[in-house]
Amino acid sequence: MVRNKYLTFLGAGLLFMASACNDGYEKEPVEQFTLDYLFSRVDSAGVQSRRFLNNIYYEHLYSGYNRVGGDFLDAASDDAVSVNNNDPAVYKLLIGRYSALTRVTDMEWGEYYQGIRKANILINNIDVVPFNLKYTNALGEVKPLNYTMKAEARFLRAHFYFELVKRYGGVTLVGDQVYDLNDDIELPRNTFAQCVDYIVRELDEIKNDLRSLPISDGGDYAHAPTKEACMAMKARVLLYAASPLFNEKPIEPGNELIGYASYDPERWNLAAQAAKELIDEFGSNGKKTLALTADYRNISTEFYSSTSNPELIFFRPIGKGKGIETANGPLGFSGNAQGYGNTNPTQNLVESFLMKDGKSTDKSKYTYNSNDPYRDRDPRLELTVLHHGSSWLNTQLQTNFGGANNPSGAEYSRTSYYISKFMKDYKTKSEYDSEALHLWVMYRYGEVLLNYAEALNEYQSAPSQDVYDAIIALRKRAGIDGDDNYGLGALGSINKTDMRKIIQNERRVEMAFEEQRYWDIRRWRIAEEVFAKPLEGLNIQISGAITTYNKINVLSTTFNVKRYFYPIPYSEVIKNKNMVQNPNW
């Protein structure tokens, strides 16, 4: 390699330049620097190489906060709709108005390959930097900083590949190669199985070269991936790989680019064991450095702490501000307290929240009142959704159509709901002047428990105590009554199919708006069923002291089977004779 080559381009095709704009990392125009400058043999502090690594985080590790044209990705699922009626990007994702030629947000291809290329540049060059800075790895060994920087780059590369795989199926694996414009890059796609094996192998190889929680040299490195993050990613990757879309019910049987050649139930066992290894080493059975955070709100608003936020595993820092509150808060307030209500939760999501005893409205010990529908519900409902009667800024919300917080006009809540999740619990308008820390949480211990419960339930013939325990832990933290095993009933009282439905609903409720539901309904292969039902909201009528809640259809759509995978960009297929397009695109 010619080390004084300027990085004035990052290639074409698979390697084209991305233009992400995210906050939280130091932005450096690294494309204008030479390799000799970025990876200097005299830079013992590794200043420029660390900036280069930060650039990979900054440009290619995306925050999910309102990232799809101002909306959460969940507004392309059955959990929410966009307030914007003017054909927003998330609506195009929802109804399938995209193609190999017409791309919309979330169909990143070149952006992830650019991140992979940058990671490979660091991997190939970091060892020439004579670091005098040290860190302590997951094994307790003190090593030069380049060891963990290389491992971090490989972690990020694994993340980018997984993001590609869940969107497109098998993609081209380039190894450690750094391709330039003049190189022959007419490479074929690898199979889905090859991609999964590669990602898992990478994570296994690097986990002990990373730090472990709590990060002893925090501050600048508080966001760094750890051994725990490696293990959490592995558990998620294997859960996806075992899921029906790729394993049991592929959309095109025998097509190894988008799934396995045949079903193997052992894949569920691999996923369960990956999650259990993390639980056993760092959770309740091991070092106890990971646990469920007592206050559900703290998960996305505080850095890792063994006391106040032990659930946090890996995140993208957003910084302090009120951007999330402004984008998603309710209408009807003045000055800087005014929200725009971009993403509106659906009645479909609200109905997935059970009663406070963990049972459905028709089986609960609590009497469900359709004219007071939020009383005695799962406490996570109030922490996820703002509804008629909720308190925000010391004000009881009026989200009936034409009410103070849902005024008639072009921009109003289409469902009568707003998001409360992720937002700081501001009590008064004066408090609203202060800025809150926000983190985009990418991996947390609560998900690990859900992954374990799902994989183990699918592998076993009937739900075991371990499956129960994982769900009970989440419900207990949420504040669900302990009666009747937190609503689950006695061990052995429900079968595998019933437990599957419970786990899927628990995942929907626990991880609402965390970019899980959109992908879950795909990997479970239930999107046709989900979108056969309309997305609903409420028409709230007030007559004297009586408030009535009537369901309304907000949006109806269908789901074409080919949409389980995005189309590969036409520009990639037309210039690479070896690039096979996804089915029916």
Predicted regions and their residues:
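Bacterial Sec-dependent N-terminal signal peptides
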Residues: 1-31
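Long, intrinsically disordered, low-complexity segments
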Residues: 20-22, 112-115, 198-200, 296-358, ...
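Short coil/turn linking the two alpha-helices of tandem helical-hairpin repeats
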Residues: 163-167, 172, 214, 237-249, ...
